[in-house]
Amino acid sequence: VSAPIRDLPELHSTKAARLLAAAGELLIGRGAKGFTVADVATRAHVGKGTVYLYWPTKEDLLIGLIGRAFLHLLDDLIDRLSAEPDLARPSRFCPAMLQIATSQPLVAALQRRDDDLLGVLTDHPRSIALDGALGPAAVLGAVLPIWRRNGLARDDWDVDDQNFALRSLITGVAFSMFGPHGGAGVDDPMAVLAATITAILGPERANQKQLRHTAAEIIAFLRDAQLTALGLISSPINE
């Protein structure tokens, strides 16, 4: 677990951990509109007042759940890149990021704007800020220049246009696999995604030193992103 995540209260309090687990189960099972703070307390076997010791409002608790989903997404990417710098290749990084993101139900729900699940959280300023700073589009926007500098993406194409093409590809693949009519229609959609990324970005010409440098740069960005997430979880922004 990365250093920023170690500061979360649930890692030091079993009550906080139970409350988060209970709130997560209720959110996934009933949607944001389908339960109260009292329901969370009952499921966690604590008094209602205990919830407010950690989260002043239900809104803060739910934003905390979404923020933690992003934190764990980033932490998973950091762990994988640290163990295997070759994962920094675009053809490997993008499928890995998509798989990790879609394995986090709240991140996936935010990407598809699932109002039934998220309710007011769908358009909440802090949800929007979390996705804008830490979502797949934000991560791609940060790592594309790193790839271009290190021989992993062609640099003869306007970076904004290149980023748009890449985001459109990944969004389309995600929708085809996990949208309302899910089912990609191919045996290995991630292999197709990897090949298409290479077709868009060009051959990955980086040597091992460049790959290690790329992985280190991406990890540094992801660690900064975790700090951003923690700030958004703990400090409401002007709404």
Q: Model features per residue range: what roles?
A:
Residues 18, 26, 30-60, 64:
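Helix-turn-helix
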Residues 18, 60, 92-96, 161-168, ...:
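Amphipathic alpha-helical interaction segments
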Residues 12-23, 40, 65-73, 77, ...:
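Generic hydrophobic, amphipathic alpha-helix propensity
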Residues 101-126, 141, 210:
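Amphipathic alpha-helical segments used for helix-helix packing
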Residues 119-152, 157-175, 191, 195:
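Amphipathic alpha-helical packing segments from all-alpha helical-bundle domains
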Residues 64, 78-109, 113, 163:
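Hydrophobic alpha-helical connector segments
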Residues 2, 138, 142-150, 175, ...:
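C-terminal peripheral helix-coil segments that are non-catalytic and often amphipathic
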